[in-house]
Amino acid sequence: MLVLGIESSCDETGVALYDTERGLRAHCLHTQMAMHAEYGGVVPELASRDHIRRLVPLTEGCLAQAGASYGDIDAVAFTQGPGLGGALLAGSSYANALALALDKPVIPVHHLEGHLLSPLLAEEKPDFPFVALLVSGGHTQIMAVRGIGDYALLGESVDDAAGEAFDKTAKLLGLPYPGGAKLSELAESGRPEAFVFPRPMIHSDDLQMSFSGLKTAVLTAVEKVRAENGADDIPEQTRNDICRAFQDAVVDVLAAKVKKALLQTGFRTVVVAGGVGANRKLRETFGNMTVQIPTPKGKPKHPSEKVSVFFPPTAYCTDNGAMIAFAGAMHLGKGREVGAFNVRPRWPLSEIVR
């Protein structure tokens, strides 16, 4: 069965073809990054219009890449939510119209479920069950995943998502949009412990997270540096040091919470998905992750246990059609009536989990 996947939740237009027997056949992506850069952020109306312009050419590009035709498509999957309303409608309208024309089922997909399952597109796939860290510009959540459609929310950010905190901190430092990736790049040149920022909620007993206070700590440090220098500009090395300290704090919190989730569930496999999953520091830290089962005071310590960690291929960390095509393929037979164009800009993942 050949499934066409369509992603249009924000500022990337993704189209892909996934074959249930042969795997991913084609993957095409257009990013609107340059278009939104001059505005310093995503402009929803512009995003929607650009999706409309890109969907047909990207679909035809995927078909050519796979050596297939419209008649070979067996189902159409699309991102129903969450995301920008207009952007979602662009993808939904196209998906439903195409499915209607082809007389094929249409499969609505939750955007976060697409990210959650994206590591299964890699050659080396994780086995169920596993702890999943969904970390992006819009969401930071820790899930227990026991199988396709069997997800339990363990914890999440109570305010800013980690990726959002990266972007907002980058803006505080005067970095160009989108700043999160640039911040990570500059952090590579930062000196260890030149600045030390708090790790919010790192010692809380639950798996909740918070990053807004960390952003405030960066602002305080930036204002202090500017006051000391008597200028708005921040010295290059100081800026790099702040970037490193911020990134270290975020990664430390994420790692600590995931370790707690592993101890809570008893799982020893971790999957990291979402845009921040491409972060080099995060990959390095999680790649060396171990857990140690706590022991009563005075008792011999348990040996540390190595954790198996899986990341999606870098190309599938950002929003993409491949993850939607794959998730749709996993839900074949559950398509809703063709012609139902509703989208869900706000759609908690808890509504599809058991």
UniProtKB/Swiss-Prot annotation:
One Pfam family here: TsaD
SUPFAM superfamilies: Actin-like ATPase domain
Cofactor details (free text): Binds 1 Fe(2+) ion per subunit.
Superkingdom to which the source organism belongs: Bacteria
TM ranges: none
GO molecular function, one term: iron ion binding
Residues reported in the UniProt entry to bind Fe cation: H111, H115, D319
Cofactor(s) in the UniProt record: Fe(2+)
Subcellular location: Cytoplasm
Protein name according to UniProt: tRNA N6-adenosine threonylcarbamoyltransferase
Organism: Neisseria meningitidis serogroup A / serotype 4A (strain DSM 15465 / Z2491)
Gene that specifies this protein: tsaD
